[in-house]
């Protein structure tokens, strides 16, 4: 058995032992995934899902949140901890995505971590769940 065959067997065993676990947050696209992960800081996923289920059917793109403005975002996420700080991050994150990334969520750690409110853990979750890159998000 050559190294390539051994590698395939090892990968098969690892994939079976450590399957991809879906994130418990509900989202519609990579942008709403990013927002949900940002909202989940110091908050339960259940609470985030309860709040976002009323938001995402209508507001699910960066331009939607820029049009809403910070105060309206605050009122929509009021039930989530530190909502004023998170609303500010979501507003400026959305604005930055439009101005620097054509409204798209970037798919590199470097670009994600430059976005307002996005740290390495948030970037890791988005890279893994949103783009399928191997990542190990750590809180």
Language-model-detected regions and their locations in the chain:
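Catalytic cores of DNA base-excision repair glycosylases
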Residues: 2-139
